[in-house]
Amino acid sequence: MDDVVIVGGGIIGAATAYFLSKEGRKVKVIEKDPTYKTASFPLSLGGFRRQFFQKENILLGKFAREFIFQIPDLLKTEKNPKPTASMVTNGYLLMFGPEHADEQYKALENHKACDAGTKNIKGSELNNFFPYINSEGIETATFTDNQSEGWIDPVSYTHLTLPTMQVV
């Protein structure tokens, strides 16, 4: 008998199944597309970032990054001693016009409180960092260093986590 049944095997369901299985729980995931050919997560961009408005999401983003960096150790098996999710760390640049700048300035306070490593760039200085971007109408922008944010290959990640759960 299963200890836990999870409905939906996307990134949240798969992550939940993984962490519960690491605690010794028997987990079954019910996924309408158990082949993952049309499931949303493998078809997504696989981004991970810290730049959110709420502290909870910032902290979750930090946790996800640490997990992703540990994939080679956490998900290795006899059959796959060097697993990878083809991680690319490239950072994220988010830009805001005057109508959303105040909202972002408030979010930056949360970024600082959570040690997210976010840098604020005035719109007038954006071209000093990114000369190929048209900064017209940009009030402010935020960026993290290249090691904090990026993306993984969702298909590779899905295949790495499938052995930790029974998908039906």
Positions of the model-derived regions?
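Short, flexible, mixed-charge acidic loops at enzyme active sites
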Residues: A39-L45, I133
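Short beta-strand to alpha-helix junction loop
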Residues: G97-A101, T144-Y157
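N-terminal Rossmann-like FAD-binding beta1-loop-alpha1 element of flavoenzymes
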Residues: D3-K28
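Conserved small/polar residues in nucleotide/adenosyl-binding loops
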Residues: T158-T164
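Glycine-rich FAD pyrophosphate-binding loop
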Residues: K22-S40
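Dinucleotide-binding Rossmann-like beta1-alpha1 core, especially the glycine-rich loop
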Residues: L45-F129
